[in-house]
A protein has these predicted regions:
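Non-heme di-metal
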Residues: 2-119
Length: 119
């Protein structure tokens, strides 16, 4: 029985090594890696963290400009500020969507930000 388990564990380890080598080969050859492709867990987590940080900075970055909308001296200036705020918000939403394709939810990312687990 243990011999069967040993072979099974060995096959799983070999498969894992093959997957990792295939991943590294793709990186070396500069082949595009899609979100559903296999990648090491640490790589996926780091990628999600980086994308989430960028998304958070886009969303948080629109807030100071938003405060100036009511203080803008002309309608033309208000329109410019509104466009900038909308642009920042859109960038944040695109980035949250990119993180979602990697297997996390927008709610998880925002909750982590609010709880101080992510910056």
């Amino acid at each position: 029985m243990s011999n069967t388990l040993d072979r099974s564990e060995s096959a799983a380890e070999t498969h894992s090594v093959d997957l990792e080598q295939g991943f590294l080969d793709k990186i070396e050859s500069e082949t595009k890696i899609e979100p559903k492709d296999w990648m090491p867990d640490a790589y996926r987590k780091t990628l999600i963290r980086q994308i989430a940080q960028h998304a958070h900075s886009e969303v948080v970055g629109m807030q100071p400009e938003g405060n100036w909308i009511t203080r803008a001296p002309t309608l033309h200036r208000k329109i410019g500020l509104l466009a900038k705020v909308q642009d920042e918000c859109g960038h944040g939403l695109y980035l949250y969507s990119a993180a979602e394709t990697l297997g996390t939810s927008r709610e998880e990312l925002v909750t982590a930000l609010h709880e101080g687990r992510m910056k």
